[in-house]
C-alpha cells in the first residue's frame, strides 16, 4: 500500500511539472526563416503565428507564388524548431525516458 501512495505522489509531481512546462513552452517564441533570412515568421509554443517580417524586395505582384512558398517554408522551419524545443524540455522532465513514437502528452 505504501508503494501505491508513493506512485500517486510521483504522478502528482509529474502532473505539476507538466503544467509548469506547458506554461513555459506557451510563452516561448521561435523564429523560422526562408529566402536567406529575407522572410521570417515567429511562433509561440502553441504554434500561434505572432510575427511576420518580409523584406520589401520579395514583394513582386507578378510573382506572388514565390512569396507564398517562402512563407510556408519559414512557418515550417519555425514549427520544427518549436517541436525540437518541446522535445528537449520533455526529455529533461522525463529524465530521458524514451516514450513510444507518436505518444503525445496533453499539450
UniProtKB/Swiss-Prot annotation:
What's the short name of a Pfam family annotated to this entry? YbaB_DNA_bd
The answer to keyword Cell inner membrane applying to this record is no
Keywords recorded for this protein, A-Z: Cytoplasm, DNA-binding
Which coarse location class describes where this protein primarily resides? Answer: cytoplasm
Q: Is DNA-binding a UniProt keyword of this protein?
A: yes
**Compartmental location:** Cytoplasm, Nucleoid
What domain of life does the UniProt record list for this protein's source? Answer: Bacteria
InterPro entries in the record, alphabetically? YbaB-like_sf, YbaB/EbfC
State one molecular function term (GO): DNA binding
A GO cellular component term found in this entry reads: cytosol
What quaternary arrangement does the UniProt entry report?
Answer: Homodimer.
What's this protein's family per the entry?
Answer: Belongs to the YbaB/EbfC family.
Instruction: Note the PANTHER family from the entry.
Output: NUCLEOID-ASSOCIATED PROTEIN YBAB (PTHR33449:SF1)
The record describes the protein's role as: Binds to DNA and alters its conformation. May be involved in regulation of gene expression, nucleoid organization and DNA protection.
Q: What is this protein called?
A: Nucleoid-associated protein amb4104
Q: Which organism is it from?
A: Paramagnetospirillum magneticum (strain ATCC 700264 / AMB-1)
